[in-house]
């Protein structure tokens, strides 16, 4: 049987191990709960779907790394990590309900995997929050997930250019003029936020660089 696209990724085994350890830690009855591995394999296969160029396995690796980096700010780091796994698990570039469908997937899969109702609800809430990336003051779990998801904006000029190019490839079916207008609107919306990054670390380390990167991209789009 040929290897799946996900299994060919160099971080596949590490990702699956991370998932299994995370779920076992969160299961209410770990001795009788299902094996987490099939759920993780399904998620990894989703993240490796061919329509993905930015929202890919590399993205989930990066977001999980950032949530670990910011873990001290979270009230429930495990809920944040689970939300990172699910936040774009359902992804179709031509649809607008990806976050909602991803949250619904979490609401189905996590109870089956032995995760309790309260934590499942928190994971789904966090996934839905990635629509706006605008958590309320005091939403510590939300700030960590949103900061981790937006950290790509603070990359080096080369890394940011690669990110922007990957986003464009995901929307390759959209005509240039329409893409430029839509992308510019998203950038303006993000730049209008009083703070992109709500954790102290994210604000201190990433805010200025991210705003500079986005402003540069916006200038190019509107040139």
Identify what each model region corresponds to.
Residues 2-29, 48-55, 66-75, 86, ...:
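Divalent metal-dependent phosphate-bond-processing catalytic cores, especially two-metal-ion Mg2+/Mn2+ enzymes
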Residues 16-20, 37-41, 64, 79, ...:
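An amphipathic alpha-helix signature
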Residues 27-46, 59:
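Short alpha-helical hairpin
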Residues 35-39, 75-82, 114-127:
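Acidic/histidine metal-binding catalytic segments
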Residues 46, 102-136, 188:
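Histidine- and acidic-residue-rich, metal-dependent catalytic cores
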Residues 49-59, 91-103, 117:
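Active-site metal-coordination segments of metallo-dependent hydrolases
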Residues 63, 77-93, 102, 127-131:
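His-Asp-centered metal-binding catalytic motifs of divalent-metal-dependent phosphohydrolases/nucleases
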Residues 78, 95-98, 119, 137:
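Secondary-structure capping and boundary motifs in well-ordered enzyme cores
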